[in-house]
A protein has these predicted regions:
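Membrane-proximal intracellular helices of multi-pass ion channels
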Residues: 1-480
Length: 480
């Protein structure tokens, strides 16, 4: 294990986090708020160890897959702990476990909150709370790859593999560092475009910024107690469209950028993703049409909610907890499916779900025709058995973590639907669940123990399980 490289990168993470805290400090100063001191102290606390750890580059720059996984997992934990300090020092949240839960929920773009009301919070805290979504959406290690002038064996690719969502990582161009820059360029472009369209709809600048951060990162922290219900249909429509856009694999946008529209439109995962969204909207609208004054309003709010859930954003315009059983069941299924691989969305990912179903049909076919040789195809290519194995192992680990989490938080004696959807909402990085953790509720009712379990789930879901699990695997720390 190359500990010197791991600590060196964590040092850079702390320095970057200090820089990313500056906009929140500026917002606090603009609004003359007392939380400015909390941000200043946190910046100093990040810089002291950060500067010490990066003073000297490691001599040994060999960086294998396990170093990549450990670095990513530890970086997210350290980043979350330091990011929780402004909540505590400002008095916005007094319980350290609650502060950690809220911060992890922000960075992992989950949007689950322990706060019963957010409108009393200071602007600086609200800004930081939403900004964590934007930081975590594309990944802070991916951002670091754009900046850090470090060369080493396997360094760039192993970091990117460990942090990027989906069953596999694709380099858009030969150099991984250039790929990271392209991804962030596309991310920034879509962010600015949505911001402009929100301003056109006369949304205040501060509200627009916080909304854009939540949409881009598919997070869901709002600055209103009713999430997004108080805004106009135009603004809700803009957010609906951009939630869907941020849930698409960024490789598709890169193909459009490279003037290869035919290749982009052939993306199978994106077609499945859009098809699932369209079908879900039509079916749910049929069942909830009597809940609204017109069919248009029913379609409008259902489209918003479907986009919010499948992309794991978590914004809400209505309390879907009050809808009939079938619409709620569809929304729960969408929680598990999630967005596309290579997007900022969470969940199992559309590509994995498609591969799982095709693996199932292949096995059924081979049971009928044992001598048949049949390959699984996806995106126009035969899928390598290594990818299929990784998908199957991922699902096994996912089910195990899910089941254990539901069992452990059962200690609080809440109903099964609450516990089940609380784990679904955190492990899939969505935010709201059903019943006591519905869109009009919060996670503050859970004990500290359960909050820590759900915090683990949020980190595990964002990091695709394995980087976090490897921290607890004895073989990770062995010297070979």
């Amino acid at each position: 294990m190359n500990y010197s490289m791991i600590f060196y990168i964590i040092g850079w993470i702390l320095d970057v986090e200090a820089a990313l805290l500056v906009p929140s400090l500026a917002v606090s100063l603009i609004y003359h708020e007392s939380c400015a001191l909390a941000f200043f102290i946190t910046i100093v606390l990040c810089l002291i160890p950060g500067v010490i750890l990066v003073r000297k580059q490691p001599k040994n720059k060999v960086f294998y897959a396990r170093e990549g996984s450990v670095t990513v997992a530890l970086s997210w934990i350290v980043m979350s702990i330091m990011g929780s300090i402004p909540f505590l020092l400002s008095g916005s949240i007094t319980n350290p476990v609650d502060a950690l839960f809220e911060t992890v929920s922000g960075f992992t773009t989950t949007g689950a909150s322990i706060l019963p009301a957010v409108e009393p919070l200071q602007h600086g805290i609200l800004f930081w709370r939403s900004f964590t979504h934007w930081i975590g959406g594309m990944g802070v290690l991916v951002f670091l790859l754009c900046l850090l002038p470090l060369t080493g064996s396997g360094y760039h690719m192993n970091l990117m593999k460990a942090e990027s969502p989906g069953p596999s990582v694709t380099k858009l161009v030969p150099k991984v560092q250039s790929t990271a820059k392209i991804l962030y360029g596309l991310y920034l472009f879509l962010t600015v475009l949505e911001f402009i369209l929100l301003l056109v709809g006369r949304m205040p600048v501060f509200d627009s910024l916080c909304t854009v951060f939540g949409t881009a990162g598919t997070g869901g922290f709002g600055i209103k107690n009713d999430s997004f219900g108080s805004y106009s249909t135009y603004l809700q429509g803009v957010v609906t469209v951009f939630m869907i856009l941020f849930g698409i694999n960024f490789n598709v946008y890169f193909l459009f950028y490279m003037k290869k529209p035919k290749e982009a439109l052939r993306c199978e995962e994106a077609r499945w993703y859009l098809g699932i969204i369209a079908t879900s909207i039509l079916v749910i609208t049929f069942f909830v049409r009597d809940f609204f004054d017109s069919l248009f309003l029913a379609f409008h709010h259902v489209a918003f909610q479907v986009a919010s859930i499948i992309t794991t954003t978590g914004f809400a315009t209505v309390d879907f907890n009050l809808w009939p059983t079938i619409p709620k069941t569809i929304l729960v299924l969408l929680m598990f499916i999630g967005a596309c691989a290579g997007s900022t969305g969470g969940g199992i990912k559309v590509s994995r779900v498609v591969l799982l179903f095709r693996s199932l049909t292949k096995e059924l076919s081979q049971n009928l025709h044992p001598n048949q040789v049949r390959k699984i195809h996806f995106e126009g290519r035969a899928v390598d058995h290594v990818v299929l194995r990784s998908v199957n192992v991922f699902m096994a680990a996912y089910i195990l973590i899910f089941a254990i989490s539901v069992l452990l938080i059962g200690i609080d004696n809440f109903d099964l639907v609450t516990n089940f959807t609380a784990v679904a909402a955190t492990l899939n990085n969505i935010g709201p669940g059903l019943e006591l953790v519905g869109p009009a509720q919060n996670f503050g009712l859970f004990s500290n123990f359960s909050k820590l379990i759900l915090t683990f789930d949020m980190l595990a879901g964002r990091l695709e399980l394995f980087p976090l699990l490897l921290l607890f695997y004895r073989g990770t720390w062995k010297r070979f």
